[in-house]
Amino acid sequence: HYCLDIRDKEMYPELPPMQIVINNAGVQNEDDIDINLKGTIAVTEHYAVQPEIRSVIMIGSASGHTGSEFPEYAASKGGVLSYTKNVAMRIAPYQATCNSLDFGGVMTELNKPVMEDEKLWNAIMDLTPLKRWMSVEEAAEWIYFMAVQNRFCTGQNILIDGLEAGNSNFIWPE
């Protein structure tokens, strides 16, 4: 894997043709559109739209389906959902798949401040039917299955949120 600022195309390393591309870059700040959407498009166009590709996985968000949480974040992830279908159509001639895995809450470092705020965490759990968030390992299992084992499902935005979207009133407090 590579860590870099995906907004800077000059930083992209030259690599042999890839078979799997997983777009996992993401932020929740003033750079949401530039990183979450434009950066995802740039990486995908640079590395994934080519004959050797077998699978492209976009890491979307439940917010892309519901519009919940922060406006720029929800809009950036909504754009990823539409772009997933565009890529799926373009790589289908290579017998490749492209899907978006749209997680709800995941126990990551990015979400650590939320998990450590007892009042906020309890309020979120009150709205979460399973009363927990997904582990990183559970997310990795979904990614592996869709990237490696799946050969037919394509162009799909798969909502994996433990039914959080069932509570459409979920908005982060200001």
Question: For the regions a protein language model found, what residue spans apply to each?
Answer:
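Short C-terminal tail/terminal secondary-structure segment
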Residues: 154-174
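Catalytic Tyr-x(3-8)-Lys segment
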Residues: 118-137
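Short, small/polar-rich loop/turn modules that mediate ligand/substrate recognition or access, typified
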Residues: 92, 97, 153-156
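C-terminal substrate-recognition "lid" of short-chain dehydrogenase/reductases
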Residues: 132-160
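Short, flexible catalytic-loop segment of classical short-chain dehydrogenase/reductase
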Residues: 102-113
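Conserved NAD(P)H cofactor-binding loop of Rossmann-fold oxidoreductase domains
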Residues: 24-28, 163
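Catalytic loop of short-chain dehydrogenase/reductase
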Residues: 55-79, 84-93, 105-106
